[in-house]
């Protein structure tokens, strides 16, 4: 276990690039070190921050508790049968690197989730998703350290209670389970999922008449994302800032009467998912800026750190977007990233 560092700058550890410091900071390189961390005098399970890639947090002020940076690495195959492979990745693995690793192995299932920022450990928490695939579709199980019992436990896919951008780890399990690794069930044969947006056309372009592969899909997703989304290493951001709102069928029908071209996606339960980016774009908010925080000029769903944005700049901008969209569509937007501390959330 690495030594504790005090008054540590967290700017490099959050992709929006908000300036904040941690009172205490420690890097976790091996899951077994959790047993030592929980016995540190600086440890308080009510205030500790388990930090991965920092791509889904907004640090609104200095962090008064202990920050544990998950740096445990490792990928291994644990089972193979009937065209399916179970592959385990440690929580500290960079998500995109892991996806590329599985594609290089000839496995299928994660290619649509290419280039999503963050680490493997965050994928079940947020139930990350893109281009018609969600983490829940490929997660077999999640290995955790249970802070209640101070033991390692394995939670099945069903145990995780996945929903749209939700999971057990954001609800009842928040503050109890520390994710140390995730097991994914991937296919040895390629099963394309090309029904979302312009993905099929891009894959066809890249495959140039031959049979498409998982790598073609991954490359297509990367090309599309790079054309629309800013690189957080160049322009600070947390990816999609708002969740796509889900509304009732009756309300959706009323909106479609007023806006026939509105993108909408009927759900199995009868509700309808809308595109938050389209709603924001219709309010002509692309490029809108408050202080150093701005709506990205090409993708309305992304807020960026354009010029040393303060936490207050980000909050005011997000609040303005929420109010503007609600005033026009009577649809409420909810932020995807976690506000820290939570009292700042809108």
UniProtKB/Swiss-Prot annotation:
What pathway does the UniProt record associate with this protein? Cell wall biogenesis; peptidoglycan biosynthesis
List the catalytic activities from the record: UDP-N-acetyl-alpha-D-muramate + NADP(+) = UDP-N-acetyl-3-O-(1-carboxyvinyl)-alpha-D-glucosamine + NADPH + H(+)
The main place the protein resides is cytoplasm
- Tell me which UniProt keywords the record has, alphabetically: Cell cycle, Cell division, Cell shape, Cell wall biogenesis/degradation, Cytoplasm, FAD, Flavoprotein, NADP, Oxidoreductase, Peptidoglycan synthesis
Disulphide connectivity of cysteines = none
Domain named FAD-binding PCMH-type is located at 18-189
The cofactor required is: FAD
This protein's record includes keyword Flavoprotein = yes
Could you tell me which Pfam families the record lists for this protein?
Answer: FAD_binding_4 (PF01565), MurB_C (PF02873)
Q: Which InterPro entries match?
A: FAD-bd_PCMH, FAD-bd_PCMH-like_sf, FAD-bd_PCMH_sub1, FAD-bd_PCMH_sub2, MurB, MurB_C, MurB_C_sf, Oxid_FAD_bind_N
Give the annotated active site.
165, 240, 336
The UniProt record lists the EC number as 1.3.1.98
The UniProt entry, under PROSITE patterns, shows: FAD_PCMH
Q: Where in the cell is it found?
A: Cytoplasm
Sorted alphabetically, the Gene Ontology cellular component annotations on this record are: cytosol
Q: Name one GO biological process term.
A: cell wall organization
GO function terms (MF aspect): FAD binding; UDP-N-acetylmuramate dehydrogenase activity
User: Is Hydrolase included in the keywords of this UniProt record?
Assistant: no
Q: What does this protein do?
A: Cell wall formation.
Q: Which family does it belong to?
A: Belongs to the MurB family.
Protein name from the UniProt record = UDP-N-acetylenolpyruvoylglucosamine reductase
